[in-house]
A protein has these predicted regions:
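Glycine/GP-enriched mid-protein hinge/lid loop-to-helix segment characteristic of carbohydrate kinases
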Residues: 2, 16-18, 26-29, 37-40, ...
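Conserved phosphate-binding loops in N-terminal lobes of ATP-dependent enzymes
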Residues: 4-8, 12-70
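A generic "binding-loop/recognition-motif" signal
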Residues: 11, 112-113, 157
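Short glycine-rich anion-binding loops that position phosphate/pyrophosphate groups of nucleotides
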Residues: 11, 71-74, 137-139
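Glycine-rich, phosphate-binding/catalytic loops in enzymes
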Residues: 22, 83-87, 150
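Glycine-rich phosphate-binding loop and adjoining helix at the ATP-binding site
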Residues: 34, 38-46, 50, 62-66, ...
Length: 170
């Protein structure tokens, strides 16, 4: 079985297909072209996911599920991006839209949390129970793993660093 991971960023949408050994077997990218309606961006995410699957020499029938890492405050239970400044999303129903477009089970998480979990499962933090990951892209984010689980805080903004004041009025 194969899995698709999508990195939804303020500049680019990147998709990767991995196998059960966490090996990336296909990729595809496109520009995000913000600001645009959530429906248009989801259509592009679905297209890029299908392109990555095709580039891997596979079909969507071989894909078990799709995981999306998105900037900002993400509610993984409701599968909604509550707020993402660089996408201009406010309570965007990304999970529901992507499920309709792809027919696959959708998982969604803050991008930095997803990166932190990926590092804990298959990357630099593999074998640890606690780790911190800082992401730098269109924005700045952070993900924390405590006891092998993602820490996201009570409001899903757990370790988001993008709005940390360094210089007052700066």
């Amino acid at each position: 079985m194969y899995y698709v991971g999508i990195d939804l960023g303020g500049t680019n949408i990147a998709a990767g297909v991995c196998n059960e050994q966490y090996e990336i077997v296909g990729t595809a990218t496109t520009k995000t072209n913000c600001p645009r309606p959530c429906e248009e961006i989801c259509a592009d995410m679905a297209r890029v996911a299908e392109e990555a699957v095709k580039n891997a020499g596979l079909t969507m029938d071989q894909v078990e599920s799709i995981g999306i890492g998105a900037p900002g405050a993400v509610d993984p239970n409701a599968k909604v991006i509550q707020f993402a400044n660089n996408l201009d999303f406010h309570f965007a129903p990304v999970g529901e839209l992507m499920q309709k477009l792809t027919g696959k089970e959708i998982y969604i998480e803050n991008d930095a949390n997803a990166a932190a979990y990926g590092e804990a499962v298959a990357g630099a933090a593999k074998g640890t129970t606690d780790s911190v990951t800082i992401t730098l892209g269109t924005g700045v984010g952070g993900g924390v793993i405590i006891g092998g689980k993602v820490f996201s805080g009570f409001n899903h903004f757990g370790t988001e660093l993008g709005h940390t004041v360094i210089v007052k009025n700066g």
